[in-house]
């Protein structure tokens, strides 16, 4: 039986879960486009979707904020229909064998700081900054980082007067313990500084592959949170960031130095990483690690196909009496064809690749996420699209490789 929402959207299979409610793949019947549909049972103890949809509506129009198509109730469910996005940064991190290159981390950091700044400019803090809540766009927006899931977001100041919420203590931990700020662990009311500190841990997670406080065991959730808190507080920032550019330690030290109601200097933090990016000689071509892996696997498959055709060609030579005694170049001329050159190993020159992708492992990874592959998304998001302002130093048309960077993995979804 076909399930419909709002008399316009067809409900499909479940594709994920958010902080409150489940997410389904849907279809806009009139437009023929795929959408994401978030459902929440109306009988739930603490209904949240209506509040979340209001926050999304307040955020509409911002760069990297998903478009809301429809909100309402349908039968026993509260419903929110949203723009369908691509994979989360956590999905892509796994796709890239749980390690991002410095170039990819810096490209992401620039956009992620801007997303958090935009939310703060709208008088809200996110309170659950983690890789799962940042998604890449699809198609022409395949290089744009989106921020999602406002189920735990909170207003931190009055929209008219900008009066900040009061300082409080003895608060329960809200968010994800792995990325929570130290003040959040200590029970202090969250503010702008905490979103940015969480982002610092996310960036080091991308650098390191894991954080020192991951994998700790405890009998209860509360005890586990305490162990994470202890490990986080006893790990100096310089130790956490050892072996990586000093900008990461500078970023975290800056965030931890902020007072409760301070307005962070977002431009300073962005510039920290932009200066590092330029010193490293990287190019703002928006080719991320996952683009290189996808392209590398594709190139390897092409090489294998050429090699197969070459073998068949040689086999035909050996069976053809007219060409059997001729050298391969001469036999090629006799048939009016050129000899196929042997395949050359793939040697990526971009800073984004940590190692040369092997054909088998690349294709194996691609197969595991085959549901998410989005073929042929061109790299055509300009830097002004990403930051909301024009910056002519960042990218020129000549830097954009044709169709090298497909957005990697398709339509996973809002969590």
From Swiss-Prot:
One Gene Ontology term, aspect cellular component: cytoplasm
Catalytic site positions: 128 (proton acceptor)
Binding site for ATP: 15-23, 38
Subcellular location(s) of the protein: Cytoplasm; Nucleus; Cytoplasm, Cytoskeleton, Microtubule organizing center, Centrosome; Cytoplasm, Perinuclear region
Omega-N-methylarginine modification, residue list: 375
Biased composition (Polar residues): 347-358, 380-400
PTM annotation: Autophosphorylated on serine and threonine residues; this autophosphorylation represses activity. Reactivated by phosphatase-mediated dephosphorylation. May be dephosphorylated by PP1.
Keywords: ATP-binding, Biological rhythms, Cell membrane, Cytoplasm, Cytoskeleton, Golgi apparatus, Kinase, Membrane, Methylation, Nucleotide-binding, Nucleus, Phosphoprotein, Serine/threonine-protein kinase, Transferase, Wnt signaling pathway
Residue segments, region Autoinhibitory: 317-342
Compositional bias of kind Basic and acidic residues: 301-315
Tissue and organ expression note: Expressed in most tissues, including heart, brain, testis, kidney, spleen and lung.
Residue ranges annotated for the Protein kinase domain, each copy included: 9-277
Enzyme class: transferase
Reactions catalysed: L-seryl-[protein] + ATP = O-phospho-L-seryl-[protein] + ADP + H(+); L-threonyl-[protein] + ATP = O-phospho-L-threonyl-[protein] + ADP + H(+); L-seryl-[tau protein] + ATP = O-phospho-L-seryl-[tau protein] + ADP + H(+); L-threonyl-[tau protein] + ATP = O-phospho-L-threonyl-[tau protein] + ADP + H(+)
Stretches for region Disordered: 301-415
Cross-referenced CDD domains: STKc_CK1_delta_epsilon
Annotated PROSITE patterns: PROTEIN_KINASE_ATP, PROTEIN_KINASE_DOM, PROTEIN_KINASE_ST
Modified residues (Phosphoserine): 328, 331, 370, 382-384, 407, 411
Molecular function in Gene Ontology: ATP binding; kinase activity; protein kinase activity; protein serine kinase activity; protein serine/threonine kinase activity
Single biological process term from Gene Ontology: signal transduction
Family affiliation: Belongs to the protein kinase superfamily. CK1 Ser/Thr protein kinase family. Casein kinase I subfamily.
Subunit text: Monomer. Component of the circadian core oscillator, which includes the CRY proteins, CLOCK, or NPAS2, ARTNL/BMAL1 or ARTNL2/BMAL2, CSNK1D and/or CSNK1E, TIMELESS and the PER proteins. Interacts with DNMT1. Interacts directly with PER1 and PER2 which may lead to their degradation. Interacts with MAPT/TAU, SNAPIN, DBNDD2, AIB1/NCOA3 and ESR1. Interacts with AKAP9/AKAP450; this interaction promotes centrosomal subcellular location. Binds to tubulins in mitotic cells upon DNA damage. Interacts with GJA1. Interacts with MAP1A.
Known role: Essential serine/threonine-protein kinase that regulates diverse cellular growth and survival processes including Wnt signaling, DNA repair and circadian rhythms. It can phosphorylate a large number of proteins. Casein kinases are operationally defined by their preferential utilization of acidic proteins such as caseins as substrates. Phosphorylates connexin-43/GJA1, MAP1A, SNAPIN, MAPT/TAU, TOP2A, DCK, HIF1A, EIF6, p53/TP53, DVL2, DVL3, ESR1, AIB1/NCOA3, DNMT1, PKD2, YAP1, PER1 and PER2. Central component of the circadian clock.
Domain description: The autoinhibitory domain is involved in regulating enzyme activity through autophosphorylation and possibly, through heparin binding.
UniProt protein name: Casein kinase I isoform delta
């Amino acid at each position: 039986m076909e399930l419909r929402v709002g008399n316009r959207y067809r409900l499909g299979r479940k594709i994920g879960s958010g902080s409150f409610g489940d997410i389904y793949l849907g279809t806009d019947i009139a437009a023929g486009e795929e959408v994401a549909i978030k459902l929440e049972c109306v009988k739930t103890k603490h209904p949240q979707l209506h509040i979340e949809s209001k926050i999304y509506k307040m955020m509409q129009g911002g760069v990297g904020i998903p478009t809301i198509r429809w909100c309402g109730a349908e039968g026993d469910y509260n419903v929110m229909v949203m723009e369908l996005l691509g994979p989360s940064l956590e999905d892509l991190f796994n796709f890239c064998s749980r390690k991002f290159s410095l170039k990819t981390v810096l490209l992401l950091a620039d956009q992620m700081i801007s997303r958090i700044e935009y939310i703060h400019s709208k008088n809200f803090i996110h309170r659950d900054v983690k890789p799962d809540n940042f998604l890449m766009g699809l198609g022409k927006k395949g290089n744009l980082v989106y921020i999602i899931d406002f189920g735990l977001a909170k207003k931190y100041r009055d929209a008219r007067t900008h009066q900040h919420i009061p300082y409080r203590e003895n608060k329960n931990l809200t968010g994800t313990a792995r990325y929570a700020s130290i003040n959040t662990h200590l029970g202090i009311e969250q503010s702008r500084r905490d979103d940015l500190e969480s982002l610092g841990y996310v960036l080091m997670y991308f650098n390191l592959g894991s954080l020192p406080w991951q994998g700790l065991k405890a009998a209860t959730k509360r005890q586990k949170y305490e162990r994470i808190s202890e490990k986080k507080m006893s790990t100096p920032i310089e130790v956490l960031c050892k072996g990586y550019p000093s900008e990461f330690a500078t970023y975290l030290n800056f965030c931890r130095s902020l007072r409760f109601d301070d307005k962070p200097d977002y431009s300073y933090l962005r510039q920290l990483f932009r200066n590092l990016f330029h010193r490293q000689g990287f190019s703002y071509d928006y080719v991320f690690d996952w683009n290189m892996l996808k392209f590398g696997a594709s190139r390897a498959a092409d090489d294998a196909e050429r090699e197969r055709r070459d073998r068949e060609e040689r086999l035909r030579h050996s069976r053809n009496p007219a060409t059997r005694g001729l050298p391969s170049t001469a036999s090629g001329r006799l048939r009016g064809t050129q000899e196929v050159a042997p395949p050359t190993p793939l040697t990526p020159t971009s800073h984004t690749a940590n190692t040369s992708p092997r054909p088998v492992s690349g294709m194996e990874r691609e197969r595991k996420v085959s549901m998410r592959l989005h073929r042929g998304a061109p790299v055509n998001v300009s830097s002004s699209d990403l930051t909301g302002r024009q910056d002519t130093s960042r990218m020129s048309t000549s830097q954009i490789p044709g169709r090298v960077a497909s957005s990697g993995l398709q339509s996973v979804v809002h969590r």
